[in-house]
């Protein structure tokens, strides 16, 4: 990073230092009150939709009660990482640094992120789903977010299951990934899902024209973190 800034370093040492790490979803500690979370590190707070696009806009974590509870009674608050650092880096013509520090990411992969609060405003869960709106080249690697999170929490101690293909699901070339993993550590139950496959009806070659079809595949990841001992739904995800 020092080489990227060159002569600008003497004028902006704080910028170089701050670009080393942005507060992200996985920095948030379960059991923390909403009022004590680093709200300044995030923007665009809204009610979550179980990992989908944001719904009603809200002012911050402490507005969790404005979001309807899920079946578990928890309130999902979606948000994005603050993008001020990205724009500051761009202003200094550091496109590489801006790319690294830009967007909302989990372990360097673009993601939709949210936090789950109980009625008392205590953080009880974290959720991340790979962002399918990104360009095709980046989306190809989205499934790797699950492995990156597993590495972050330690490569050992994971229980993983490779699920069989569902109806109409096929490999991409020779690759078929449909894996769920779980680990309990430091009072947390961490659940990851990785998918790399073609769904029913998706193809690489248009059978009528013989032309290449782009984007017809699933490459995705999902992360759910709850307190150890959390109940699971029918799909094995923590509730």
Regions inferred by a protein language model and the residue ranges of each:
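Bacterial N-terminal signal peptides
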Residues: 1-10
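Non-cytosolic coordination micro-motifs
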Residues: 17-65, 90-112, 119-239
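A low-complexity, Ser/Thr/Gly/Pro-enriched, surface-exposed linker/loop concept
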Residues: 63-90
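Sec/Tat signal peptide C-region and signal peptidase I cleavage site
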Residues: 10-18
């Amino acid at each position: 990073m020092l080489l990227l800034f060159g002569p600008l370093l003497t004028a902006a040492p704080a910028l170089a230092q701050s670009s080393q790490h942005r507060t992200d979803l996985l920095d948030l500690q379960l059991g923390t009150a909403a009022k004590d979370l680093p709200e300044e590190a995030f923007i665009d707070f809204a009610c979550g939709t179980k990992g989908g696009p944001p719904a009603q806009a809200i002012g911050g974590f402490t507005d969790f009660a404005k979001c309807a509870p899920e079946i578990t009674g928890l309130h999902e608050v979606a948000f994005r990482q603050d993008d001020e650092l990205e724009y500051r880096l761009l202003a200094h013509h550091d496109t590489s640094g801006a790319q690294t520090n830009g967007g909302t990411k989990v372990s360097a992969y673009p993601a939709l992120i949210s936090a789950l609060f109980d009625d008392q405003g205590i953080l009880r869960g974290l959720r991340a789903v790979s962002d399918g709106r990104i360009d095709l080249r980046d989306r190809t690697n989205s499934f790797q977010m699950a492995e990156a999170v597993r590495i972050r929490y330690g490569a050992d101690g994971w229980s993983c299951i490779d699920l069989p293909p569902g109806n109409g699901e096929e490999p991409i070339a020779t690759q078929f990934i449909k894996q769920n993993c779980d680990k309990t550590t430091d009072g947390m139950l961490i659940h990851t899902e990785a998918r790399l496959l073609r769904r029913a009806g998706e193809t690489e070659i248009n059978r009528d024209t013989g032309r290449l079809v782009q984007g017809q595949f699933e490459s995705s990841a999902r992360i759910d973190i709850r307190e150890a001992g959390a109940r699971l739904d029918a799909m094995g995800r923590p509730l």
